[in-house]
Regions:
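PLP-dependent class I/II
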Residues: 1-197
C-alpha cells in the first residue's frame, strides 16, 4: 500500500530503551524501494535525540533509477562523525561479486573496534582486489551508469510483465536489482507459487 516505504511513525513506536541501532537499507533488498530524504532526516534526528546509532547499508546507492527519485544518505547530515555508520561494497555497482571487498565509514571509535574484529575474521583482502577497488571508485563511472540504465530497462519489462498477470501486483522499484511482486491475488501461498514455477 505504501510502495514498501518505511513509515516513520510506525518506526518511532517500535523504539524502546533497548534500541541501540537502526539499520536502513536503501535502496532496499528485496523491494527496491528508496527511502526519501525527508524520512532519512527524521530518522536521523530521532536517533540523535535518543543516542541510537544508524547503520546505513548503501550497497545499492549507485543503482537508483533516474525516473524514480534520488538516493540520500544519513552521512550527508552527520558526515559519519557521531551516530551514523555507512556500509558499502563493490560487488553490485562495479560487478566485483565474490571479491569480498567493502568499506565502512563511521565514528572513529567504532571503526577502530571494527578493525580489531576484522583482524580475527579476515586476514587480508588480496592487494590486486584492493587496487581494483580503488580504480573502481576513482575511475571512469560510465560502466556503472550503463549498467544502471540497462537494469532500469529490464526492471520496466519485468514489472510490466508481472502486472499483466491476473492476480499479481508489483510496484516499480526505485533502485537496486529487485522487484517484489504481491501474489496474494492468486489465491496460493508463496511456496505453492514457487513450486508451480
Amino acid at each position: 500500500k505504501n510502495k514498501h516505504q518505511l513509515n516513520y511513525d510506525d518506526l518511532k513506536k517500535l523504539i524502546t530503551e533497548k534500541t541501540k541501532l537502526i539499520i536502513i537499507n536503501s535502496p532496499s533488498n528485496p523491494t527496491g524501494s528508496v527511502t526519501a530524504k525527508d524520512d532519512i532526516s527524521k530518522i536521523y534526528e530521532l536517533c540523535r535525540e535518543k543516542g541510537i546509532f544508524i547503520l546505513s547499508d548503501e550497497i545499492y546507492s549507485r543503482s537508483v533509477f533516474k525516473d524514480q527519485g534520488e538516493f540520500y544518505s544519513p552521512s550527508m547530515i552527520d558526515h559519519c562523525n557521531n551516530n551514523v555508520l555507512i556500509l558499502n561494497g563493490f560487488s553490485k555497482a562495479f560487478a566485483m561479486t565474490g571479491w569480498r571487498i567493502g568499506v565502512a565509514i563511521g565514528p572513529k571509535h567504532l571503526i577502530e573496534k571494527m578493525g580489531l574484529l576484522l583482524q580475527t575474521v579476515n586476514s587480508c583482502v588480496p592487494p590486486f582486489i584492493q587496487k581494483a577497488a580503488i580504480e573502481a571508485i576513482n575511475g571512469d563511472q560510465s560502466a556503472v551508469r550503463m549498467m544502471t540504465e540497462e537494469y532500469s530497462k529490464r526492471r520496466k519489462v519485468l514489472v510490466n510483465g508481472l502486472n499483466s498477470i491476473e492476480g499479481i501486483r508489483c510496484h516499480m522499484p526505485s533502485g537496486s536489482i529487485y522487484a517484489f511482486p504481491n501474489i496474494s491475488g492468486l489465491g496460493m501461498t508463496g511456496e505453492e507459487f514457487v513450486d508451480l514455477m
